[in-house]
Amino acid sequence: MEVECLSEPAEIAIARTANPRAFAPRLLFPDDCLFRREERGIGVMDGMARRDTRTFFDRSVCPETNFYIGEVVHQPGKWSSFPPHTHVEPELYYYKFLPENGFALAEYGDDAYKVKHNDLLGMSANVTHAQACTPGYAEFYLWCIRLQDDKPLVSTFVPEYEWVNDPDARFFPNEK
């Protein structure tokens, strides 16, 4: 495959994996994507998990794929992928920040990592994960999940934190 970039600078992410299915490569355009833009976290947690998600593709639009790939534009000072969740598939996050000196904290099981501009974080199977971005900095991350052969992705929230998704949840004892 040959790519001609028409802008300066340009970045390309390449994800590769084994796939027993035979199929021709193809270029997906924005209109081919599963969701062009999905606002998540609205109406729960007082908006503290507000983010925009764009899912590029999964098996519903590319039946031959072994990937589920998309991106998140994460609001400054807010959480993403909260409550923490897990799945049996491994996942990669590739980070960008604006301004570039920003950072976020990435939960990885019982640990947290400071992730910065151009960092890559790999999540092993069945490891809980969520993100918290610093105030004043916008975070972008590209996510890539290697799907199991012929099995759907099943994400599971950590039960002890799932209550925060209730639109009527109260976060402070005297909150009205």
Predicted regions and their residues:
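Double-stranded beta-helix
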Residues: 8-51, 107, 142-176
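Conserved metal-binding segment of the jelly-roll/cupin
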Residues: 1-6, 17, 114-136, 142-146
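A short beta-strand-loop-beta hairpin characteristic of the jelly-roll/cupin
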Residues: 93-117
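Conserved hydrophobic/aromatic beta-strand scaffold that supports enzyme active sites
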Residues: 12-14, 69-73, 92-94, 112, ...
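Short, structured patches in soluble enzyme cores that scaffold and shape functional sites
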Residues: 5-7, 14-19, 55-59, 71-76, ...
